Amino acid sequence: MIKRVLFGILVGVLPLLASDELSIDSLFKKQIGLRSITNLSLLSTGNANSYTMYPNLSITGNPTIWNDTKQLSLNQTFIYTLHPKFDLLVSGNGSYARQEYTNFFTGEYSHNNKWSFNSLWLGLIYTFNSVADFVPQISFQSAVVQRETFVNEDKNFYLKSQNLQATLRGYSDPVVYGIYGGFGYNAKRKFEFAKVEYGNSYYIGGDLSIILSPKITLDLGAEQRFQTEQKINGYQNSEIRSIPTLSIGSTYSVNSDTAVSLSASLGGSSAAPDAIFGLTLWQKF
């Protein structure tokens, strides 16, 4: 989520770069009103894990072992600025997944197709006054509802996951950057046949946008995430998972209210997905 919010700052700024001198305060000054972030992403796991994409990449508790999963996810986020320092956030997402496996009895390759509403999140973002060359920001999000799968059981869970993140943002011509760290909490899930603990997440990362022209940026990012052990019925069935990712992309500012970005992320360990390709539309109202 941090990358989407950080790059969203550039919507409306890029067309002004040719004539306006930017400062740390003018760049991050927010106008009262509504912003929309629509993200379409294609994930290829290349491993046996299942993943959630929002608010951050994490491994779910489904113990089914797949050869590979190709997942197309649509995420819609609305951010309403009540005050230059205070934002409200609501985000919902759903996905289509092609889950590939080898038939145990015949040895043939096969797959399942699954359409699903995934989750609805509410959040708050508070932006502090600038300190030296940085603008501190803190965000908190809670899952209102999450629809999750354990083997063949689908079940809705309410208020079971929360995410807290602290960010330092800055600008040094021609780069807009963010450094962040956070914690993701997952409460125990009770399915019909099992009680599952997904494990909690700890992560740090950074993103930067290099302004190439008044309309185009080159976007880079890196993140290191650790997810604690998963337990089923109190028995540990995984070690701590390391999920490093690297990303590259570009943002094009259509006008002062609209921008489009393309991005690609690569995993750096066996617990990380092979690749994520994303298309994002930013809109101010």
Residue ranges of each PLM-predicted region?
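Outer membrane beta-barrel transmembrane domains
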Residues: 49-51, 55-60, 103, 195-285
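Outer-membrane beta-barrel biogenesis signature
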Residues: 17-52
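Outer-membrane pore/translocation modules
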Residues: 93-194
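Repeated loop/turn-to-beta-strand initiation elements of outer-membrane beta-barrel proteins
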Residues: 85-90, 131-136, 174-179, 214-220, ...
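Residues that define the transmembrane beta-barrel architecture of outer-membrane proteins
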Residues: 68-74, 111-122, 156-164, 194-204, ...
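Detector for outer-membrane/organellar transmembrane beta-barrel domains
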Residues: 32-46, 153-230
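Surface-exposed strand-loop-strand hairpins of Gram-negative outer-membrane beta-barrel proteins
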Residues: 42-73, 110
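Residues on the lipid-exposed face of transmembrane beta-strands in outer-membrane beta-barrel proteins
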Residues: 76-80, 122-126, 164-172, 181-183, ...
